Amino acid sequence: MGDDYTDSIIDELYKVICERRDHPRQDSYVSSLLQKGTDQVLKKVGEESCEVLLAAKNQSPPALIHELADLTFHLLVLMADQKISPSAIKTELKRRFGTSGLTEKASRIIGVADHA
């Protein structure tokens, strides 16, 4: 289902990010970002999300690719911060695969209502 290289690079990036989280380095952007705390990581994810939207709005495929890569990277940093592995995301996507998006969304709404 997945592109082996894409799966590999995502997993490799995640491993490096976790390494920087667990063994901070002074010369590491990731270590620096993670040491600033979750709020700073969330701020970066928000910034990168906005940049993706702007690149898409401007209909610039090269810029959009660049910004999507930045967003993906910062999502991996957030995942490492929260100790959520790429395999957990893959498992959730596989669970949803083949299910109507409307059906899946309705099941989440019902689940939320059940917990209210």
Located regions from the model:
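Flexible "arm" and connector segments at domain edges
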Residues: 1-68, 72-116
